[in-house]
């Protein structure tokens, strides 16, 4: 982080695995209690987040895809764990939810999250969600309070590069539920399974699609 901070004046962002997701993927042979395990991970993540902020991170994101696998447990523990992980952190606080890498889960995905609206009660500033591949029902975004939403508008299950107009259409759909200052267009998830050419092309389409919508919004003022 210090290396990066020393070489750019732009905002920096770094991601960390979320405490809930880590807890649900490990075998507990010590605590014998799910809540204690989750909160222990949250405490460890908090120490890392504080160090990253001190080193210059502007945005810190927790990846919490596993809240979808046990929504009942997520309702009991996830918000408190996320807030504990960010306790004392002044940087922009974000969390990412998805249904799995598109390359790994290329087929039909749910069109709704079993755990999402609950994050309105968290201390998060931003919520990142996969929406393009699963064709998410975006009405749920209205329930996220004043959070900024990083809306997935790039389908990463295919290397095919979207047109700028396709991306613009997905952004417009998000704007039907959110004010422009609360929507950040983004890829659905990580792009590590794409070729460099495909990833670059998709990111360019993202920029071009956002520019189209930005121009439309400016024309209405």
Model-identified regions with their sequence ranges:
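Domain-level signal for soluble alpha/beta catalytic cores
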Residues: 1-221
């Amino acid at each position: 982080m210090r290396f990066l901070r020393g070489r750019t004046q732009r905002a920096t962002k770094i991601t960390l695995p979320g405490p809930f997701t880590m807890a649900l993927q490990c075998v507990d042979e010590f605590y014998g209690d799910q809540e204690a395990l989750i909160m222990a991970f949250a405490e460890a993540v908090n120490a890392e987040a504080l160090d990253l902020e001190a080193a210059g991170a502007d945005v810190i994101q927790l990846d919490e895809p596993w809240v979808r696998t046990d929504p009942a447990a997520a309702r009991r523990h996830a918000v408190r764990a996320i807030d504990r992980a960010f306790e004392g952190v002044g940087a922009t606080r974000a969390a990412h939810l998805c249904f799995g890498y598109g390359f790994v889960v290329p087929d039909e995905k749910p069109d709704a999250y079993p755990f999402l609206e609950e994050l309105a009660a968290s201390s998060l500033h931003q919520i990142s969600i996969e929406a393009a591949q699963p064709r998410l029902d975006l009405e749920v975004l209205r329930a996220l309070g004043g959070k900024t939403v990083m809306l997935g508008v790039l389908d990463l299950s295919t290397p095919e590069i979207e047109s700028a107009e396709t991306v613009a259409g997905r952004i417009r759909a998000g704007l039907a539920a959110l004010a422009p200052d609360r929507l950040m267009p983004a890829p659905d998830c990580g792009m590590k399974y794409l070729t460099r050419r495909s990833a670059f092309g998709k990111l360019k389409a993202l920029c071009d699609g956002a520019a189209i919508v930005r121009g439309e919004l400016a024309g209405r003022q």
